[in-house]
Regions:
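Generic beta-strand/beta-sheet core signal
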Residues: 111, 174, 182-183, 194, ...
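PRPP-dependent phosphoribosyltransferase catalytic core
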Residues: 162, 177-178, 214-220, 314, ...
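Secondary-structure transition/capping motifs at alpha-helix termini
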Residues: 131, 151-152, 283-287, 305-312, ...
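A short acidic (Asp/Glu
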Residues: 55-56, 183-184, 299-302, 393-395
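Flexible loop/turn segments at secondary-structure boundaries
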Residues: 22-24, 87-88, 118, 188-189, ...
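Phosphate/diphosphate-binding loops
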Residues: 160, 208-209, 216-217, 221-225, ...
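Conserved short alpha-helical segments that host acidic/polar catalytic motifs at enzyme active sites
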Residues: 1-223, 228-286, 292, 380
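Short, glycine/charge-rich flexible loops or terminal/linker lids adjacent to PRPP-binding catalytic cores
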Residues: 308-353, 364, 391-398
Length: 480
């Protein structure tokens, strides 16, 4: 990768376990629950009495481990796993995690969810001092920082490295005798800790993975925290006290599974509240509510309950196609929208439809769905979005890193309405979003990062700053 501001970057899912004889198999099941967070590649690294073993490849988890022998060989009582979407770096096997590093004095595995905002500067400095990178992923940078630290203890080395990298990150580090887990100072990415019946400790991007393996949730990892897990138990520490919660609001809006809980808030419940608040802000007459499956169904329920309108199944999704936001090229997204949804004419014909969707990024999906509903006979289609207008890029690990690819950054609400062919377009207010999610915290914006909506980033953008400032002067329309 060249570390410029580039489009189509997203997030991943990580899972780890310490202290179970079936660690790799449980990691497989955990990753299966996180498959929605990335479909380009997957991998598992196991720890068998200090011996690290790994299998990784391109494709879905089931494809990567299609041969049972590849999972069976990953013996040991500790494991970390990763499902990947190309946050940074090219889509190749070399960039599939977990990474494994073997130096003359240490070996360890690494899994990372997020994006580093000072990766270019750090990589340049590391290479200048002799570091050799085996991938184009920014995730590899932390390993070189750990290796080159002069701190006398391993934990000291890890803390120093974590204090050097900037951006949004959740790290799982598998060493010979311990698993170390950490979050960035703002906790942009979700990460939770659980416990198995036998005492094994598990870590996951989302709590939905705990249900599958029978683990009990203990607590969420805190911003700036270092969690050390070994045979003696769990130790909680910090590499910085300069922390302030600003978790990605898109986790609640779109990314996370409805059955996951993040910072004490159930995702389905938050989305229902978003839908209810959206109904209070909606100003048009309608007959039925139709949610775009699957991530908008919770918001549609809340909208219908608040408005008193019937919630109908006016759109059917082919469950065997990939999520369009996560596919890595615009051409694939266009094809994906055509393949994934069908309108139910018997439900929408002659009706004024409120079409609930979670967000509008490029407008590709919204325009096609409005067209589908009108072709099926809907007399009016009013688009109601369960999030504010997405007008600013994200640099902490989401699939939007240039303003040029955001329709709301380049068009007014009325222009966007015309482009997507809707009879009206309503976005949820930022205040409505914050209140709907309702994290119990004193942090600004209710503990959420809402920079995608208002352009106020919680941290400096480092290597991305200059390009971002330049992009603010540009206005692009990709619709003619």
């Amino acid at each position: 990768m060249t570390y410029e501001v580039k489009s189509l970057n997203e997030e991943c899912g990580v899972f780890g376990i310490w202290g179970h004889p079936d660690a790799a198999k449980l990691t497989y099941f955990g990753l299966h629950s996180l498959q929605h967070r990335g479909q380009e590649g997957a991998g598992i690294l196991s720890n068998d009495a200090g011996q690290l073993k790994r299998h990784r490849n391109m494709g879905l988890l089931s494809e990567v481990f299609k041969n049972p022998a590849n999972l069976d060989k990953l013996t040991g009582t500790g494991a970390i796993g990763h499902v990947r979407y190309a946050t940074a770096g090219e889509a190749s096997v070399d960039n599939i995690q977990p990474f494994m590093f073997k130096f003359h004095d240490m070996q360890f595995g690494l899994a990372h969810n997020g994006n580093l905002t000072n990766a270019a500067s750090l990589k340049k400095e590391l290479e200048k001092n002799g570091a050799i990178f085996s991938s184009t992923s920014d995730s590899e940078i932390l390993a070189h920082l750990i290796r080159r630290s002069h701190k006398p203890t391993l934990i000291g080395k890890v803390k120093e490295a974590l204090s050097t990298v900037k951006g949004g990150f959740a790290y799982l580090l598998m060493f010979e005798d311990k698993l170390i887990v950490s979050l960035d100072p703002n906790g942009y990415r979700p990460l939770s800790i659980g416990r198995m019946a036998n005492g094994a400790i598990v870590v996951s991007s989302e709590t939905c993975a705990f249900e599958v393996i029978g683990a009990e949730w203990l607590r969420d990892v805190k911003p700036g925290e270092v969690v050390i897990i070994d045979d003696q138990g769990i130790q909680y520490d910090y590499y910085t006290t300069d922390t302030q919660l600003a978790i990605c609001s898109m986790e609640y809006i779109y990314f996370a599974r409805p059955d996951s809980n993040i910072h004490g808030v159930n995702v389905h419940t938050a989305r229902k509240r978003m839908g209810a608040q959206l109904a209070r802000e909606f100003k048009h007459e309608a007959d039925i509510v139709v949610g775009v499956p699957n991530s908008s169904l919770s918001a549609a329920m809340g909208f219908a309950e608040e408005s008193g309108l019937p919630n109908e199944m006016g759109l059917i999704k082919n469950q065997y196609t990939q999520r369009t936001f996560i596919q890595p090229t615009q051409e694939l997204r266009e094809q994906g929208v055509r393949m994934k949804l069908s309108a139910v004419s018997g439900v929408v014909k002659g009706k004024r439809v409120v079409m609930i969707d979670d967000s509008i990024v490029r407008g590709t999906t919204s325009r096609r769905i409005v067209q589908l509903l009108k072709e099926a006979g809907a007399s009016e289609v009013h688009v109601a979005i369960g999030s504010p207008a997405l007008a600013y890029p994200c640099f902490y690990g989401i699939d939007i890193q240039t303003r040029q690819e955001l329709i709301a950054a380049n068009h007014t609400v009325e222009e966007t309405r015309q482009i997507i062919g809707a009879d009206s377009l309503t976005y949820l207010s930022i205040e409505g979003l914050i209140d709907s999610i309702g994290i119990e915290t004193d942090a600004p914006n209710g503990g959420l990062c809402v920079a995608y909506f208002d352009g106020n980033y919680p941290t400096p953008l480092y290597d991305y700053e200059e390009e971002y400032r330049r992009s603010l002067e540009e206005k692009t329309s990709f619709y003619k």
